[in-house]
Structure formats: C-alpha cells, structure tokens
C-alpha cells in the first residue's frame, strides 16, 4: 500500500544554504520531519547550482514522517534581476524604468523556466517572462 501524504510544505530556500534555522526548521518541525535529513539532502541536490540563488521546493510529508521533495527553477524575478544586473525592481514599474533586457536574455530565462511554465511553446514562454520583466520596471527589447 502506498504511503499517505499528510501535508505539503512549500518553501523558498537559498541553494546550498538550507539549515535548521527559520524558515526551514519551524516549518518542518511542525510536521515532525527530520530537519537535518532534509537540509543535507537539499544541500546535496543544489550543490551544482549558483550558491545563494532562491530555489522553490515542495516537500511532501507522509504519515510515517518520511518525506520527498521536488525542486523548481528559481523565480523569474530573480533571473531577470540577475540578467539586468539589478538589486531590486522598480518601485513604480509603469513610470520609472530601471533597466533593459534583450530578447536573447528573455529566451535564455524562458529556457530555464520552461519546465515550470504552462506555456505551450517558446514564444509564449518568452512573452510570459517579458510580462514579468515589465511588471518589475524593466524595458523589453525585441518582444
């Protein structure tokens, strides 16, 4: 018989930097999950990623307190800020533009995010990422 899923926990943890302190410890501790086991497994899987990049993770906690987790790609906003060389987006995105991204950069980000997007093809994915860029106050060239 398959194990019964008790809960899903959604977290965003920096790659290679999972530790028992908040937000990881309290979220997993409430469900009775072995915190250090998760931290070691997560850090091992994110070893090849850029250290410190935020990685969304969905943890499935089973009735016997075991767990599995799936990692998603970093948020589009993080990738866009990195591509544009910014620390943060615009406070007033419709009036105050803070940077530019090219179509080539948008295609690169869309390629990374394709697994998590519901877009049917690459062009739709690029338009989705371009919309995120405009919402952050970035100008999009060639879209």
Curated annotation (Swiss-Prot):
Assembly: Part of the ribosomal stalk of the 50S ribosomal subunit. Interacts with L10 and the large rRNA to form the base of the stalk. L10 forms an elongated spine to which L12 dimers bind in a sequential fashion forming a multimeric L10(L12)X complex.
HAMAP family: Ribosomal_uL11 (MF_00736)
Family statement drawn from the similarity comment of this UniProt entry: Belongs to the universal ribosomal protein uL11 family.
Entry keyword set: Methylation, Ribonucleoprotein, Ribosomal protein, RNA-binding, rRNA-binding
SMART domains reported for this sequence: RL11
NCBIfam families noted in UniProt: L11_bact (TIGR01632)
Single GO term (MF): structural constituent of ribosome
PANTHER family tied to this protein: 60S RIBOSOMAL PROTEIN L12, LARGE RIBOSOMAL SUBUNIT PROTEIN UL11M
GO cellular component, one term: cytosolic large ribosomal subunit
Function: Forms part of the ribosomal stalk which helps the ribosome interact with GTP-bound translation factors.
PTM summary: One or more lysine residues are methylated.
Gene Ontology BP annotations: translation
Source organism (scientific name): Saccharophagus degradans (strain 2-40 / ATCC 43961 / DSM 17024)
Protein name, per record: Large ribosomal subunit protein uL11
Positions of disulphide bridges: none
Pfam families per UniProt: Ribosomal_L11 (PF00298), Ribosomal_L11_N (PF03946)
């Amino acid at each position: 018989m398959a194990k019964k899923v008790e809960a899903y926990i959604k977290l965003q943890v920096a790659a290679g930097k999972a530790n028992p302190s908040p937000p990881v410890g309290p979220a997993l501790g409430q469900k009775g999950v072995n915190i250090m086991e998760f931290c070691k497994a997560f850090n091992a899987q994110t070893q090849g990623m850029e250290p410190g990049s935020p990685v969304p993770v969905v943890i499935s906690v089973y009735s016997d307190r075991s767990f599995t987790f799936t990692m998603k790609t970093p948020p589009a906003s993080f990738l866009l800020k990195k591509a544009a060389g910014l620390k943060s987006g615009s406070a007033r995105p419709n009036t105050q533009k803070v940077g530019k991204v090219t179509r080539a950069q948008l295609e690169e980000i869309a390629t990374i995010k394709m697994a998590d997007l519901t877009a049917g093809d690459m062009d739709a994915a690029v338009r989705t990422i371009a919309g995120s860029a405009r919402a952050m106050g970035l100008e999009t060239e060639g879209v």
